[in-house]
């Protein structure tokens, strides 16, 4: 009986290998695209990714083979062509268009910067970062800066040699009085931060001519929240900031002192309190205090994240522990739309090219939501792979399809929303690469199972085109990983 099965299987394999199909190989990346004169090619339907990759390399005349991935109708080919045709009911008489892209290059560990306490937030200033482009500034290669906000209440600016260029002042001199959970560059000379002391603080940042030392100087203290602040978003062209707070509200602020209203008196520390907390120096520290342009109140639980629409800064989005994603008109401070889900939403990122918002959840997955009122379903796709809460998200600067997530399971995962399958839960995506904490590897515990990511929880991740993937968390480190062109550009 086994012999009959084996011969039948062999015959089927032989038949599939002998079948042929016309394929049109295309690429959106000009540097690897075949000449337009390259027409459809007749290939065996038994070909898989490796054989197709060899074929493309031969057609391109590459001396050094480049690994490629292949997509049909926007989805990765994970089987033979024959199996794909059968599964999708497509005739082998059809000319099949197959798109090829560079395969994933695993992001390698570049460096780690050690802190004295947990690191709650990271951001990058580079030639390709938003803060640089907004200011029409220039950051030369090697002069990139990394900003960290720590649970010790201090901001630090680092160079790429893991040296601290500047540290923010103590509470006595205008610094934060509690843990920092969010910090961002507004421009090469301006920083904003917030945390558990309920304040949003604006800072001036300057460096010496040689770039070896710098100064973070307090500029404005913004009061309005009645509980800790979990995240920040900035839009420098409009001089606006969004803050997400555990007091269930979103703060909408101006970076310009002249535009901002007075700070609420009931939230500003009294003069007596301030003088007792701040030691006397040659001249007492006097920092302007301002209030919010608006407080957006509709959520019924802590707000985890608030961001600007990438293409329209008058639109904002927020996520909350109340399971909802909300859309706001920032001009009128009005609630526009509410999308309710089944889980607490802990992080948020915009994928504008696909009209999607990525939301990290307490249920260990990422839900992609179409915020447009015309959308008929709440969840467009679910990304699964993490084993604990997903608390930070950052889009891939190289590809509109890419995303990275940071989780309390101690990993960052790279996603390509084209890498999907369909099951009982609908369209489900799987991560294409997982980045573990270097601190575990150095302890010889890279394969150790950490319950809930104990000791290595990731709190923040930022993906920068120039610097790479920068993450930070409970292991008191910033970690930098880089893989050139991790996903295809598109």
UniProtKB/Swiss-Prot annotation:
Ubiquitin-like (UBL) domain as annotated region, ranges: 21-102
Keyword Nucleus appears in the UniProt entry: yes
Major subcellular site: nucleus
Gene Ontology MF annotations: ribonucleoprotein complex binding
WD repeats (start-end): 129-168, 175-213, 224-263, 298-338, 340-379, 385-425, 453-490
GO biological process terms on file: chromosome organization; maturation of 5.8S rRNA from tricistronic rRNA transcript (SSU-rRNA, 5.8S rRNA, LSU-rRNA); maturation of LSU-rRNA from tricistronic rRNA transcript (SSU-rRNA, 5.8S rRNA, LSU-rRNA); protein-RNA complex remodeling
SMART domains registered for this protein in UniProt: WD40 (SM00320)
GO cellular component, one term: nucleoplasm
Top-rank taxon, per record: Eukaryota
Keywords, in A-Z order: Nucleus, Repeat, Ribosome biogenesis, rRNA processing, WD repeat
Gene3D superfamilies from the UniProt entry: YVTN repeat-like/Quinoprotein amine dehydrogenase (2.130.10.10)
InterPro entries for this protein: G-protein_beta_WD-40_rep (IPR020472), NLE (IPR012972), WD40/YVTN_repeat-like_dom_sf (IPR015943), WD40_repeat_CS (IPR019775), WD40_repeat_dom_sf (IPR036322), WD40_rpt (IPR001680), WDR12/Ytm1 (IPR028599)
The UniProt record lists the keyword Nucleus: yes
UniProt region (Disordered), positions on chain: 257-285
Subcellular location: Nucleus, Nucleolus; Nucleus, Nucleoplasm
Annotated function: Component of the NOP7 complex, which is required for maturation of the 25S and 5.8S ribosomal RNAs and formation of the 60S ribosome.
Family, as annotated: Belongs to the WD repeat WDR12/YTM1 family.
Subunit structure, interactors included: Component of the NOP7 complex, composed of erb1, nop7 and ytm1. The complex is held together by erb1, which interacts with nop7 via its N-terminal domain and with ytm1 via a high-affinity interaction between the seven-bladed beta-propeller domains of the 2 proteins. The NOP7 complex associates with the 66S pre-ribosome. Interacts (via UBL domain) with mdn1 (via VWFA/MIDAS domain).
Protein name as it appears in the record: Ribosome biogenesis protein ytm1
Source lineage: Eukaryota, Fungi, Dikarya, Ascomycota, Pezizomycotina
Gene name of the encoded protein: ytm1
């Amino acid at each position: 009986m086994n012999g009959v099965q084996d011969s039948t299987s062999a015959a089927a394999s032989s038949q599939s290998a002998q079948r042929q199909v016309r394929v049109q190989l295309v690429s959106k990346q000009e540097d690897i695209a075949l000449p337009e004169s390259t027409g459809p090619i007749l290939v065996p339907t038994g070909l898989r990714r490796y054989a197709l990759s060899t074929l493309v390399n031969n057609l391109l005349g590459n001396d050094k083979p480049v690994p490629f991935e292949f997509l049909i109708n926007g989805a990765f080919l994970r089987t033979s062509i024959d199996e794909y045709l059968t599964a999708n009911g497509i005739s082998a008489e059809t000319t099949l268009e197959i798109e090829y892209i560079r395969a994933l290059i695993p992001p390698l560990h570049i460096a780690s910067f050690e802190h004295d306490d947990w690191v709650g937030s990271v951001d990058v200033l580079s030639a390709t970062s938003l803060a640089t482009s907004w200011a029409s500034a220039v950051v030369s290669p090697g002069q990139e800066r990394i900003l960290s906000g720590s649970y010790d209440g201090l901001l630090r600016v680092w160079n790429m040699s893991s040296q601290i260029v500047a540290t923010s002042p103590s509470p006595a001199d205008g610094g934060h009085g509690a843990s920092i959970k969010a910090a961002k560059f507004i421009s090469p000379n301006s920083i904003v931060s917030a945390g558990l002391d309920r304040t949003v603080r604006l800072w001036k940042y300057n460096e010496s001519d040689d770039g070896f030392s710098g100064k973070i100087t307090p500029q404005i203290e913004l009061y309005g929240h009645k509980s800790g602040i979990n995240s920040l978003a900035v839009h420098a062209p409009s001089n606006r900031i969004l803050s997400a707070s555990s007091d269930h509200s979103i703060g909408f602020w101006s970076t310009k002192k002249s535009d901002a209203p007075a700070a609420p008196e009931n939230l500003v520390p009294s003069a007596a309190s301030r003088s007792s907390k701040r030691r006397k120096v040659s001249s007492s520290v006097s920092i302007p205090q301002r209030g919010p342009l608006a407080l957006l109140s509709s959520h019924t639980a802590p707000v985890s994240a608030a961001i600007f629409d990438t293409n329209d800064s008058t639109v904002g989005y927020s996520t909350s522990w109340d399971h909802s994603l909300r859309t706001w008109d920032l001009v009128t401070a009005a609630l526009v739309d509410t999308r309710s889900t089944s889980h607490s939403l802990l992080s948020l990122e915009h994928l504008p090219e696909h009209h999607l918002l990525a939301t990290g959840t307490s249920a260990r997955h990422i839900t992609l939501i179409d915020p447009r009122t015309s959308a008929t379903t709440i969840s467009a796709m679910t990304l699964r792979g993490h084993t604990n809460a997903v608390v930070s998200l950052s889009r891939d600067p190289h590809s509109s399809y890419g995303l990275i997530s940071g989780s309390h399971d101690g990993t960052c995962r790279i996603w390509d929303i084209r890498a999907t399958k369909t099951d009982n839960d609908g369209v489900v995506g799987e991560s294409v690469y997982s980045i573990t904490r270097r601190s575990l590897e150095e302890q010889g515990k890279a394969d150790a199972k950490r319950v809930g990511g104990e000791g290595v929880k990731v709190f923040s991740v930022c993906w920068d085109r120039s610097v790479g993937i920068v993450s930070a968390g409970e292991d008191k480190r910033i970690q930098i990983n880089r893989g050139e062109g991790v996903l295809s550009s598109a």
